[in-house]
Regions:
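Surface-exposed loop/turn motifs at beta-strand-loop junctions within extracellular Ig-like
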Residues: 147-149, 438, 495, 537-541, ...
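Glycan-recognition surfaces in beta-rich domains, encompassing non-catalytic CBMs
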Residues: 40-131, 135-138, 146-147, 155, ...
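Solvent-exposed loop segments of extracellular immunoglobulin-like
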Residues: 499-503, 592-596
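Solvent-exposed segments in extracellular or luminal domains encompassing
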Residues: 520-528, 613-621
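Acidic, Ser/Thr
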Residues: 491-496, 584-590
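Long non-globular sequence segments
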Residues: 2-257, 554
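Short beta-strand segments within Ig-like beta-sandwich modules, predominantly Fibronectin type-III
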Residues: 511-518, 603-611
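Basic/polar, cationic surfaces and motifs that engage anionic cell-wall
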Residues: 2-7, 23-24, 159-220, 224-293, ...
Length: 764
């Protein structure tokens, strides 16, 4: 027998992984030597859990039962049980607990009664039970049970509270506090803040068991904590050697059949420190696994994944010592972080018969997700792991995670949807089903049940949501990419990489690169021309899927300036620091022109269809205009042109007729010529490729004839509603520089004969 020890809460603080609440663990009365010895063995030794039992007091009319608020031995998981496994509580079962860390009491927490204790009927000591609930480290409890309305038979006999300390959560006393234990989320029910007097168990004779004595705790204090177990890729030991001298050793098992898909990492029973002395019977084996039933368990989402191994130990202890089963009922347990734990012993790769779905335990395996998923979706990490385990187990027996199968009912019953089952008759089931599909329960909760189609899709394949996310080394234009040759294609998929066997990069429908399923990019070298690029994913099931096609053009030919850059004077305001001009060009590309950049004397970028731009240049200064054309693939071509604007004052012209000189700071050089005499003329001679006549304009300005190289080129009207100075009003350009003459002649317009000229600008 294990020595009895009572733990009174104070002091040492432990750390457990996420963020939030300090949890103070109890101080044991063990000696330093005892503690040191247990700490040395903690990494390899199983953890023995404590179970404490207290009978509920039933009301005279049989319609309610309770357990008064009281101090308890430390526990983290609880449930209510009763004598007849076939009996039901049709009303409600609720408990409230006191936090060992804060001393605060929770609100009333419901305990699920929709389980069937007949799962392993025929065994001695099998009891009816509620679903166990994880409440975290606690040292006080109160329970109330009410029969449902119209319940004629009242409550089941032998109502009893079972509390479980899964061990492994207490830190031995040391010289200083150990560390902080951190809870990931608060409990679902808020603390009430009040703490009425609690009733010690020994002071309430009416609460003592009437149908069976409450056994004296016979477990040692929990072993010291250890880091959360890591999933192992090695097969867990099929079963541990029993620690009791009367138990027969489990024979060495041959491996189960290979699966069509990889085995996911699984934390073995040894790693979660299962107390194998609880489960001394040999496991029962099935002929195979035809279907998987998904469950939820522990009735809370407010747990830290660092506590998951302790929760599994608590479930194991509860199923054996409270339900009276031979072992943990589920074949696999998954926490919200996606860690998979080995459940019932016998070998994870063997078809071990569990105790999870009454009437359909044969030919099936049970996977339970720790949490409550009635209204809350299970985490993606959890559903991913459920899908991986289901695919692996079904793959051992050529099952289809997306398919259906006939299962023979092992007992009369019904499911949540109202379908009835008759023992010995076969019924169709999805090969991944929820507990509610085989039994009248909400399990695995409406939200998790609604996630089963997505779980089937993950497990069965193919890879979904496959798209090309990027083409590095190429430039996109619309839906087409352009590259010189080398690219790296990146992709993404909604299916997690753990289900992907591999990816292939296809060019023109042929693979050019093959990578593993956790790789999301691959390089390729393309020949010149247009190519269709895709990614093909192979699911672990062997099913394939293709991404949409991406068009990639490989192009090594540079763009061409079909029209070289050229400069021409334009109309506008002229000053001694800026002469208006136009820069013209035309660039083309065999594939796709991206842009043309002006790099000097200023930086500008123009679109592929732009062929001219307005600029200014400083007079009397040679300026180089440099341009580079870029295509979509990154090929380039450069071209340039140089020009010098020159201002010829009116005094540089050959005069004809009558002209007067006008002075003003508004004129180029401070002076201009004006004439109202018909036929008066000015002639400039220059060598250049563009010319612009500069004038002053006003409402009274008249007209002039313009002659170029002796030929009349235009009649120009200088009239303007607003007075303007230094206006280039007329321009003329040639393809190359040459000697030219420009002559202006006063028309003598009626009513406004005068005109004022401010010189000529030419470009050389």
């Amino acid at each position: 027998m294990r020595a009895q020890r009572r733990v009174w809460a104070t002091a040492a603080v432990t750390t457990a992984a996420v963020a939030g609440v300090l949890v103070f663990q109890g101080v044991t009365g063990a000696s330093d030597a005892d503690r040191d010895g247990r700490a040395a063995d903690a990494k390899s030794a199983p953890v023995e859990a404590d179970v404490h039992k207290a009978a509920l007091k039933t009301s005279p009319d049989g319609g309610s039962a309770s357990l008064a608020r009281r101090d308890t031995e430390p526990f983290s998981l609880l449930g209510v049980t009763w004598t007849d496994p076939a009996a039901k509580v049709t009303g409600s079962v609720e408990a409230r607990t006191r936090s060992a860390a804060t001393g605060a009491w929770t609100g009333w927490l419901p305990l699920d009664t929709e389980i069937d204790g007949r799962t392993e009927t025929g065994r001695s000591g099998v009891r009816g039970t509620t679903e166990p609930r994880w409440v975290g480290p606690s040292n006080g409890v109160e329970v109330r049970v009410r029969a449902g309305d119209g319940a004629r038979s009242g409550l089941p006999a032998g109502l009893r509270l079972d509390t479980v300390d899964p061990g492994g959560t207490s830190t031995p006393l040391a010289a200083e506090p150990a560390a902080f234990a951190v809870e990931e989320t608060p409990t679902e029910e808020p603390a009430t803040g009040d703490e009425p007097p609690v009733t010690p168990p020994t002071e309430d004779p009416a609460e003592e068991p009437t149908d069976e004595p409450a056994p004296t705790p016979t477990t040692e204090s929990p072993a010291p904590p250890s880091p959360p177990p890591s999933p192992s890729t090695e097969p867990p030991t099929p079963s541990a050697t029993p620690t009791t001298p009367t138990a027969a050793p489990t024979p060495t098992l041959t491996p189960g059949p290979p699966s069509t898909v990889p085995r996911p990492p699984i934390v073995s029973r040894a790693d979660w420190k299962a107390d194998e002395s609880l489960s001394t019977e040999a496991p029962d084996y099935l002929d195979g696994v035809k279907a998987v039933f998904v469950h939820h368990t522990a009735q809370t989402n407010a747990y830290s994944c660092a506590d998951s191994a302790a929760i599994v130990r608590g479930l194991h202890t509860y199923h054996v010592k409270s339900n009276g089963w031979k072992d943990l009922g589920y074949n696999f347990i998954v926490d919200k972080c996606g860690t998979v734990f080995e459940g019932r012993k016998g070998g994870v790769d063997r078809p071990v018969m569990g105790a999870h779905t009454y009437g359909f335990n044969r030919d099936t395996t049970g996977i339970a997700v720790i949490g409550m998923y009635t209204d809350t979706k299970a985490a993606t990490a959890a559903t991913t792991s459920v899908a991986r385990v289901a695919a692996w187990k079904l793959g051992q027996y050529q099952g289809d995670p997306a398919g259906s199968v006939q299962l023979t009912a092992g007992a009369n019953g019904g499911n949540f949807a109202g379908q009835s089952f008759v023992a010995g008759k076969a019924y169709p089931f999805r090969q991944i089903s929820g507990h509610r599909d085989g039994f009248n329960t909400q399990c695995p909760g409406g939200s998790l049940h609604a996630q089963l189609p997505a779980i089937r899709s993950l497990a069965a394949g193919p890879v979904t949501g496959l798209t090309i996310a990027s083409v590095t080394g190429a430039n996109a234009s619309g839906s087409t990419y352009y590259t010189r040759s080398k690219i790296t294609v990146g992709w993404k998929a909604t299916t997690p990489s753990s289900f992907v066997k591999g990816y292939e990069l296809l060019v023109g429908g042929k693979p050019v690169a093959t990578v593993k399923g956790n790789v999301t990019s691959a390089p390729a070298t393309l020949a010149a021309g247009k190519h269709s690029v895709q990614v093909r994913a192979t699911h672990q099931s062997g099913k394939t899927s293709l991404s949409p096609v991406a068009t990639v053009v490989a192009d090594t030919a540079p763009p061409v300036f079909s029209t070289k850059p050229a400069l021409a004077l334009r109309t506008g305001t002229v000053s001694t620091s800026a002469v208006p001009l136009t820069l013209r060009w035309k660039a083309t590309d065999a594939a796709s022109l991206k842009e043309v950049r002006l790099t000097a004397p200023v930086a500008k970028t123009y679109g592929p269809t732009t062929s001219s731009a307005s600029h200014t240049a400083k007079p009397a200064k040679a300026t180089a205009w440099k341009m580079t054309a870029y295509d979509r693939a990154g090929n380039t071509a450069a071209a340039s042109v140089s020009g010098t604007p020159v201002i010829l004052q009116e005094s540089a012209a050959k005069k004809g007729g009558k002209w007067t000189t006008k002075s003003s700071g508004s004129y180029l050089g401070g002076k201009s010529y004006s004439s109202s005499t018909k036929g008066s003329s000015l002639t400039w001679t220059f060598t250049g490729r563009s010319a612009a006549w500069v004038v002053s304009r006003a409402a009274t300005s008249g007209q002039a004839y313009v002659y170029v190289d002796g030929k009349k080129a235009a009649t120009v009207d200088l009239k303007s509603s607003a007075t303007k100075y230094r206006q280039a009003i007329w321009t003329k350009s040639w393809s190359a520089g040459a000697k030219h003459t420009v002559k202006i002649v006063v028309v003598g317009t009626k009513g406004r004969p005068a005109l004022t000229t401010d010189g000529l600008v030419y470009l050389k």
